[in-house]
A protein has these predicted regions:
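Large, well-folded core regions of big proteins
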Residues: 1-316
Length: 316
């Protein structure tokens, strides 16, 4: 297309993988499950954004659906890439053939359907939120800090990309959920005082607080200050996830020099070749995220703290 830069092969591959993974995210296997509904809300919100921002691409997918021939897929042509992706996204090859995948994508990139499914997932998700503001694993269970963190992290990611409108229900969800975390994490000053090494959940909360910037009570404010001090002093003992979260926290709170030191430390653990950069010890790290999500966290941290880092291209 005139005036457009020719996309690179990694970009095309990445876009193809993301698009083929979205149908798996938008499926709602369990309306009583926070993770399932959260994935459906997130996936349909992203799909709607793709429809709005890439009308020509959507038109091309719809046109391809009308044809009998198949669209060559980099996924099926590269065994190494296929195996890496399928370890955590097995639904990508669940379709019997490429034509079926194109059909799935065409159905996914239907804005009316996206909006309908997005609304349905949000309505069900709001119904799962407990009176204390937290989210359970399943309907009827008590509020869980990890699940509540996941919901707010999803919200924050969509919010910072301007993909969420002025929805009163979402504002209420955010307010009640962050208040739950404020009380459970920052408000527990006695536990914080006795804690030598912060958990990744505490660090995830601190990063969320810098993004959402919600009011804290006097006790919660004191607890947050204690947590931040412990994070800055103890980051060297954290795992990769903890180091990345601490770097984001320090960067967002104005301590950019310390954040850069942590990023340099993270890069010291990486395997660097002429073309690629990755962390081989992710699997042995016993991270609370999946391997792909942890790599993404590390990559995003490097991009946030050192946006002009020449090594970023090798991480994608």
């Amino acid at each position: 297309v005139a005036g457009m830069t020719k996309p690179t092969v990694p970009l095309v591959l990445g876009l193809w993988f993301v698009l083929q993974a979205l149908p798996g995210l938008t499926e709602q296997a369990d309306d009583n499950s926070t993770p399932s509904l959260l994935a459906a809300f997130y996936g349909n919100t992203l799909a709607e954004a793709i429809v709005l921002k890439n009308p020509r691409f959507v038109a091309a997918i719809q046109a391809q659906r009308q044809k009998n021939d198949t669209l060559p897929s980099p996924l099926t042509q590269n065994e190494t890439l296929k195996m890496l992706l399928l370890e955590e996204t097995p639904w990508v090859l669940s379709a019997r053939n490429e034509n079926e995948r194109i059909t799935q994508l065409a159905e996914l990139l239907d804005r009316a359907k996206c909006v309908k499914m997005q609304y349905r997932a949000l309505t069900k998700l709001l119904a799962l939120q407990n009176d204390d503001g937290g989210f359970p694993w399943k309907k009827g269970m008590g509020s869980n800090i990890e699940q509540t963190l996941s919901v707010l992290e999803c919200y924050a990611q969509l919010y910072t990309q301007n993909l969420l409108g002025d929805n009163e229900s979402l504002v209420r969800l955010r307010s009640e959920a962050i208040n739950f975390l404020n009380k459970k994490i920052a408000g527990d000053t006695a536990r914080i005082a006795q804690t030598e090494k912060l958990s990744n959940s505490q660090l995830r909360y601190l990063v969320l607080q810098t993004i959402l910037a919600t009011p804290l009570s006097e006790t919660e404010g004191a607890g947050r200050t204690m947590l931040c001090e412990k994070a800055e002093k103890g980051w060297k003992s954290f795992d990769l996830e903890g180091k990345a979260l601490t770097a984001q926290l320090l960067y967002r709170t104005g301590n950019q020099e310390a954040a850069r030191r942590i990023v340099n430390s993270l890069l010291g653990y990486a395997t660097i070749t002429d073309e690629e950069i990755w962390w081989q010890n992710i699997r042995s790290n016993r991270n609370t995220l999946g391997d792909i999500r942890l790599h993404t966290l590390l990559m995003n941290t490097v991009a946030l703290v050192t946006p002009h880092n020449a090594q970023l291209a090798g991480m994608a």
